[in-house]
């Protein structure tokens, strides 16, 4: 057990086993974005067991639980995600996914367990205020936070908080930073239309594969040579589809990728650059090139007041050594950003790595957590909710 876990009150020990069992059940039963019916049913059952009224509209929606003590008092929200990811699960066989093609590779099973653990503590000793528990669908692939916003999850909410497990830090550390926590994420699809031909007669064809390869390398110069390096940005081509046989010059090729930026000016610059380069490449090689740019999640920008609440709560609950920060925003993306377009809030990270583990990245088929973090997260969300509600009530004239 970590030093931080040992600092938790004794009554948390009685909940720890239930938390581990719940998290392992969720881990064994992963469901993909907008198809989380079984997961949602388990969350509803847990909330009902605690006597917390909740609603769930069915597949495609999320679960909203409301612990209301006084309508005149402030309301805050705690958020977790229901969905998992496609891919094989190579974690502990004792709780490995029962499905061959999907797993909780991003820790959403842990997030649900933490927020439900906090719900149990808050229900047992109601706070001076109201708490909304948001269990959203489709964080990974569909911007499910917007579904929850449309469903009224933020009505009357003063601020919202969410955490995310990571092996970047050891268990016992909680990381938060002012301002940007994550990057803006956009996607692109480039279709190259050339002219097919025989591999022996390239002069009679327009090789879509060669043009695609040139595009891949040229696009990287947008970051390395045309963007201010003090503002991080990443262009990734993650998928290429082209060709039918080794001796046939491909008539078409398709590239799909992502763009990650940290400020709007860099984003606009890269979007314009991709348009310019695709148009020029088509003209240069006498090919038709079609570009489709799709807007992704905005950056998560933590608000100063809520960052202060998180930092104070970490220090008071676990001591100053538990608090850490990061020198720059993560280049990952998070649809928690949509909530922050409506209300203030803060997004932070829970270290979840055992001392003997080598860090494993999120979305890896081997990503797992030190289950000691479950009690830490539940206790922290409980304390944060109480501190935030007290703070907002005190600030109300």
Question: Where in this protein do the model-derived segments appear?
Answer:
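Electropositive phosphate-/nucleotide-binding environments in soluble metabolic enzymes
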Residues: 2, 6-9, 13-20, 33, ...
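Acidic/His- and Gly-rich active-site-bordering loop/insert found
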Residues: 2-104, 109, 113-128
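Metal-dependent amide/peptide-bond hydrolase catalytic core
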Residues: 3, 213-397
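Active-site beta-loop-alpha junctions enriched in small/polar residues
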Residues: 31, 81-83, 138, 166, ...
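A structural signal for isolated positions on well-ordered beta-strands in alpha/beta enzyme cores
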Residues: 55, 132-134, 290
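Histidine/acidic-residue-rich, glycine-tolerant segments that coordinate divalent metal ions
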Residues: 63-64, 84-103, 109-110, 121-250, ...
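Residue-level recognition of well-ordered beta-strand positions that form the cores
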Residues: 66, 189-193, 258-260, 292
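Non-cysteine beta-strand/loop elements that form the S-adenosyl-L-methionine
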Residues: 77-79, 188, 347-353
């Amino acid at each position: 057990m970590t030093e931080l876990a040992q600092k938790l009150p004794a009554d948390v020990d009685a909940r720890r086993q239930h938390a581990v069992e719940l998290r392992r059940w969720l881990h064994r039963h992963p469901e993909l974005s907008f198809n989380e019916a079984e997961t949602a049913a388990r969350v509803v059952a847990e909330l009902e067991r605690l006597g917390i009224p909740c609603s769930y509209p069915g597949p495609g929606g999320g679960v909203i639980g409301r612990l209301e003590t006084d309508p005149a008092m402030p309301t805050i929200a705690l958020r977790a995600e229901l969905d998992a990811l496609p891919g094989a699960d190579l974690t502990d066989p004792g709780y490995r996914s029962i499905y061959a093609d999907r797993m909780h590779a991003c820790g959403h099973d842990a997030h649900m367990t933490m927020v439900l653990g906090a719900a149990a503590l808050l229900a047992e000793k109601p706070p001076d205020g109201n708490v909304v528990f948001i269990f959203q669908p489709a964080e990974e692939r569909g911007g499910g936070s917007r579904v929850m916003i449309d469903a009224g999850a933020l009505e009357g909410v003063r601020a919202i908080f969410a955490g995310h497990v990571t092996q970047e830090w050891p268990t016992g550390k909680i990381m938060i930073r002012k301002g940007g926590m994550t990057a803006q994420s956009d996607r692109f699809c480039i279709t190259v239309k050339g002219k097919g031909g025989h591999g022996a007669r390239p002069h009679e064809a327009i090789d879509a594969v060669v043009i695609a390869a040139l595009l891949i390398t040229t696009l990287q110069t947008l970051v390395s040579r045309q963007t201010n390096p003090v503002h991080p940005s990443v262009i990734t081509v993650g998928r290429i589809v082209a060709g039918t046989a080794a001796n046939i010059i491909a008539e078409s090729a398709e590239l799909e990728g992502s763009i990650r930026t940290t400020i709007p000016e860099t984003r606009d610059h890269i979007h314009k650059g991709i348009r310019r380069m695709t148009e020029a490449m088509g003209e240069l090689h006498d090919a038709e090139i079609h570009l489709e740019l799709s807007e992704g999640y905005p950056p998560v920008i933590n608000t100063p007041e809520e960052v202060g609440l998180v930092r104070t709560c970490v220090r008071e609950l676990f001591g100053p050594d538990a608090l850490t920060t990061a020198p720059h925003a993560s280049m990952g993306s998070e649809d928690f950003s949509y909530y922050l377009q409506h209300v203030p809030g803060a997004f932070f990270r829970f270290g979840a790595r055992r001392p003997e583990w080598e860090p494993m990245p999120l979305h890896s088929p081997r990503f797992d957590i030190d289950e000691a973090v479950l009690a830490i997260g539940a206790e922290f969300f409980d304390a944060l909710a109480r501190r935030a509600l007290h703070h907002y009530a005190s600030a109300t004239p």
